[in-house]
Amino acid sequence: MSIFKRLLCLTLLWIAALESEADPLIVEITNGKIRGKDNGLYYSYESIPNAEHPTGALRFEAPQPYSHHWTDVFNATQSPVECMQWNQFINENNKLMGDEDCLTVSIYKPKKPNRSSFPVVVLLHGGAFMFGSGSIYGHDSIMREGTLLVVKISFGLGPLGFASTGDRHLPGNYGLKDQRLALQWIKKNIAHFGGMPDNIVLIGHSAGGASAHLQLLHEDFKHLAKGAISVSGNALDPWVIQQGGRRRAFELGRIVGCGHTNVSAELKDCLKSKPASDIVSAVRSFLVFSYVPFSAFGPVVEPSDAPDAFLTEDPRAVIKSGKFAQVPWAVTYTTEDGGYNAAQLLERNKLTGESWIDLLNDRWFDWAPYLLFYRDAKKTIKDMDDLSFDLRQQYLADRRFSVESYWNVQRMFTDVLFKNSVPSAIDLHRKYGKSPVYSFVYDNPTDSGVGQLLSNRTDVHFGTVHGDDFFLIFNTAAYRTGIRPDEEVISKKFIGMLEDFALNDKGTLTFGECNFQNNVNSKEYQVLRISRNACKNEEYARFP
């Protein structure tokens, strides 16, 4: 090569390096360069692949790290693709949406010229392990505060993410394995985007909260994040760890045309050959009515010989073993969390005007095990009927199911599906763990939220329903409209809570002027109650 050509090459490389250094939208990682987008208040880098495409031969397999190298600059200005799902909130008969090839991370960094690095909040979205995506959770409120870098991840949902035959051939939990691989990617790469790899907090809502708890049950989670917050969902909720997965997997096979095989390896091979849309659309065949059960496919306990197993023991057994990450954890609920799922019972039939709740009077023993997730936990029909009878007597006594008795039904759903697990989780963690365990209850009804959306009614007061707190952190127009001045204040305090949790090395947690009290080494339950204009530490000998 001539001297002239060498000088020309060096000059071009030097110019390219200067351009990259001068352009804050260009980030370079092992796979190559990434170009983001300037959104005014913040920079975004969306739809970055972190895993190989989970399609074809890689469907129903543990995710593999993304290994391709980009020769051109990767365009990270494309809106995130939602994983394929049968979405409860699509008000049409065909609820199919999304793409099977969806394993990406999206990063949002405040524009602060005088600041080069930020603590990191990783979001695990909710959706009952069946639907949802990080893209519906807004980040504008956090970006306006300008103190946190936000990462949203995608993971397999419904049958594509959680179908399981209960053996090593189709063990399940692929969605949880997707999450774990994404967390590893974030730890490795986030510094390139201005994130602090030693100051990462994982937060999730509903199924995302349960996922955060399940991730924490891996000892080496302590190397991936500094702490975790499970909002209105944890691993002990009855809808999280599923039984009956094998039966549903083979039923799925029959629905999509795999015949009546009872051999797991044959079923897996057949399912790999079917269109993803057929597999996901089969969800409708598992619904008893409306979108019940709301989680037809979810996490399972895998066999010990499963390759790349994520969970081989029940979460309670894992906690009792003490072999989980000793990092601070917060577990929360709202006073009327059960408004999710219960509110849909108030939806009127467009033809008859009758509501699902009216039909419960004749169908309670048929539907209750699906509504409250003990269909597969009970061994006999008599066991199911006995529990259904006891629950009705406990919460309604001799009252009929109706709009007038809705609050009794909602309280039942709140207790069984969300609240009862909180003291159980606290008890186990403080007995077998050493790291701080915090809890809060949110008690501040919104003007319009999930209750109104699911019921399609405005004539019923729902209280503080599922998501009324979380949607103040990640503003979500799809699930609520408007935000009051008091909620603006609460939103800022929640965001400050996340920043402090990520930055401090003492494992403490604060909300505005209130300091959370640690449940470890405490005989009483320590719960912070957050209401419209106040926060207050409450202490219970028995959980209320």
From Swiss-Prot:
One of its GO terms (molecular function) is serine hydrolase activity. Glycans are attached at residues 75, 114, 262, 456. GO terms for cellular component: extracellular region. It holds the Pfam family COesterase. It is found in: Secreted. Disulfide bonds join 83-102, 258-270, 514-535. It comes from the Eukaryota. SUPFAM superfamilies: alpha/beta-Hydrolases. Keywords: Disulfide bond, Glycoprotein, Hydrolase, Secreted, Serine esterase, Signal. Residues 1-19 form the signal peptide. Its EC number is 3.1.1.1. The active site is at 206 (acyl-ester intermediate), 466 (charge relay system). InterPro entries: AB_hydrolase_fold, CarbesteraseB, Carboxylesterase_B_AS, Carboxylesterase_B_CS. It catalyses: a carboxylic ester + H2O = an alcohol + a carboxylate + H(+). PROSITE patterns: CARBOXYLESTERASE_B_1 (PS00122), CARBOXYLESTERASE_B_2 (PS00941). Belongs to the type-B carboxylesterase/lipase family. PANTHER family: CARBOXYLIC ESTER HYDROLASE (PTHR43142:SF1). Monomer. This is Esterase P. It comes from Drosophila melanogaster. The gene is Est-P.
